């Protein structure tokens, strides 16, 4: 490994670990008991992904395929103060407390609204401008009219992500970061059959978050507060189920508005096309009417985490 590559690996590894630490802090702030809550390992900065944005160009100039940076950004999407984990936990508590068992209630709508907003602002605004796209289908006669991101690995080359030293520090504060098995911090095959995942756990409360990304541009995050007494907990988004996002976009659009108001774009998107849970694409257009991208969200159980979407609604 050359010296510049070693420097890049160290730098990006630090950023990746910082993102994980921030996720841990967010979980502790929400769930930890006041008298035993682990100390904050990092200062709170909201939103955390702004820091990733500041170093994006530097990473792009030095990364071979950008997978390190994409993993960092995805981690910050989940960990940010405005992110899915904290909101999902609160929604779960409210839904369980009110015994709501219909995904069409405010519980489901609130979670979906947040997912749309944050996903547009972070994933679309950050991931989709990193590198080239590929066609949705090789059988597409045009070959490059729309594209779907292929982000299927958590590390470049054969560089392992070793969490042992980090865990030595975190364990002193009641925190664990564990892989699903011993090999899952190493780059996997670039196919949808292989996934990479890690689990962040608050040892005081047993609250943990599973962060998984699959091949073919799909991701899943699970927040799983343990509420065994509630029989219908599986109907609450982000409680014991996960949310998967699939998306495609116009080949040459970077999905960043002139004034950077991605949240405004997301809010407009959600208010104008409420769609149907699990079925409809959410479509985004420029003010000229030109299609930018389409997104699709689906709730899924942990036991059914490998399904994927076929094709793409191009908005026309």
UniProtKB/Swiss-Prot annotation:
Taxonomic superkingdom: Viruses
Extra information: The killer phenotype requires the presence of two different dsRNA viruses: an L-A helper virus and the toxin-coding (M) killer virus. Killer strains of S.cerevisiae producing the toxin K1 kill sensitive cells but are resistant to their own toxin. The gamma and delta chains may play a role, on there own or as part of the protoxin, in the self-protection of the virus-infected killer yeast (toxin immunity).
Glycosylation sites: 181, 203, 216
Disulfide-linked positions: 92-248, 95-312, 107-239
Complex formation: The secreted toxin contains alpha and beta chains that are linked by three disulfide bonds.
GO molecular function: carbohydrate binding; toxin activity
Signal sequence annotation: 1-26
Subcellular location: Secreted; Host membrane
Keyword annotations from UniProtKB, A to Z: Cleavage on pair of basic residues, Disulfide bond, Glycoprotein, Host membrane, Lectin, Membrane, Secreted, Signal, Toxin, Transmembrane, Transmembrane helix
Transmembrane segments: 72-92, 112-132
Principal cellular location given in the protein's record: secreted
The protein's name: M1-1 protoxin
Membrane topology reported for the UniProt record: Multi-pass membrane protein
Biological function: Ionophoric toxin secreted by an infected host and lethal to non-infected sensitive strains. Cell killing is achieved in a receptor-mediated process, requiring initial toxin binding to a cell wall (1->6)-beta-D-glucan and, probably, subsequent transfer to a plasma membrane receptor. K1 toxin disrupts the cell by creating a pore across the target cell membrane.
UniProt lineage: Viruses, Riboviria, dsRNA viruses
Cellular component terms (Gene Ontology): extracellular region; host cell membrane; membrane
């Amino acid at each position: 490994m050359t010296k510049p590559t070693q420097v890049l690996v160290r730098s990006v590894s630090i950023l990746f670990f910082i993102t994980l630490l921030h996720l841990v802090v967010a979980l502790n702030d929400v769930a930890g008991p006041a008298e035993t809550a682990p100390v904050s390992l990092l200062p709170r900065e909201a939103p955390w992904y702004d820091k990733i944005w500041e170093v994006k160009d530097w990473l792009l100039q030095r990364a071979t395929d950008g997978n390190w940076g994409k993993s960092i950004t995805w981690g910050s999407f989940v960990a940010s103060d405005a992110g899915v984990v904290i909101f999902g936990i609160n929604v779960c508590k409210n839904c369980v407390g009110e015994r709501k068992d219909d995904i069409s209630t405010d519980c489901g709508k609130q979670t979906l609204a947040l997912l749309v907003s944050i996903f547009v602002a972070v994933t679309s605004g950050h991931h989709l401008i990193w590198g080239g796209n590929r066609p949705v289908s090789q059988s597409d006669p045009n070959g490059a009219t729309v594209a779907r991101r292929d982000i299927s690995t958590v590390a470049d080359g054969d560089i392992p992500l070793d969490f042992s030293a980090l865990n030595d520090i975190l364990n002193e504060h009641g925190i664990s970061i564990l892989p699903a098995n011993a090999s899952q911090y190493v780059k996997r095959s670039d196919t949808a059959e292989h996934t990479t995942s890690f689990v962040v756990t608050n040892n005081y409360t047993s609250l943990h978050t599973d962060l998984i990304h699959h091949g073919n541009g799909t991701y899943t995050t699970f927040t799983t507060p343990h509420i065994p007494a509630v029989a219908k907990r599986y109907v609450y988004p982000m409680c014991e189920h996960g949310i998967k996002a699939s998306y495609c976009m116009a080949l040459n659009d970077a999905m960043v508005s002139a004034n950077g108001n991605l949240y405004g774009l997301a809010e407009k998107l959600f208010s104008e096309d409420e769609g149907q849970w699990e079925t409809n694409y959410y479509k985004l257009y420029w003010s000229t009417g030109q299609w930018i991208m389409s997104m699709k969200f689906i709730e899924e159980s942990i036991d059914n985490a490998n399904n994927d979407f076929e094709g793409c609604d191009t908005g026309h």
